[in-house]
Amino acid sequence: MVKKLNLFISLILVIAVKGEDVETAVNKILPPGMQVQAIADSNIDGIKVVDIGELQPIYVTEDGKYFFYGELYSINESSINNLTDQAKRDKRADLIASNLSSADYITFPAKRAKHEITVFTDVDCGYCRKFHSEIEDYNEIGITVNYVAFPRSGPDSSSYNKIVGAWCSADPKKILTEQKKGEEPKISMCEDNPVMEHFMLGQKIGITGTPAIISKSGALFPGYLPASDLFSRLEASES
């Protein structure tokens, strides 16, 4: 969908739409199946932030005549802030909160949790295995890890079926751990599993590789990070 939208926008960026209300104007130029979800004021007078159901918003003039699709920055005395990145973080956090519950996760809790993360994982991913081999380090430092499934090879693949087996197990933590050690524990399949929903959610919020670590505030940390480094980044992102 993102590629489709990027291609579509590349064709119409130089075209101004007729003056009309923002929602009507934007809906007319969106690809089929997409529509405006929400409209909010931006930090710039006369510019609206428009949520079109993707992670990336678009920015539209109040009269609906012009828009741009890209990064919006604010310039302060001593820094430059990426306002679009903050909007993406907020959107990620909202999508995770509204689509996932505790029943969706395979959770490895910290005894004294200071941070809680959502980790999109694949049982056959090398760095996912490395991350999980250090799960006690993350828990010990105060990070609760909530795993969700993101089999990179997609539905009906070996990795997909393996991770479905973990979620269907009577002891998901045990099976997931064994799989990430390269073992092949006996698994059972079930229809009532959240793996496809996890996979589709990951695609919607822009996950392209694993492990993909997301903080409670929606900050994305792609790839493996040692416990101490991750903790430092979480502290900085939540401050």
Which positions does each model-derived feature cover?
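Sec-dependent signal peptide recognition
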Residues: 2-10
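Structural microenvironment flanking redox-active thiols in thiol-disulfide oxidoreductases
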Residues: 137-168
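Hydrophobic h-region of N-terminal signal peptides that target proteins for export
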Residues: 10-18
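Short active-site neighborhood of thiol/selenol oxidoreductases, capturing the structured segment around
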Residues: 109-129, 145
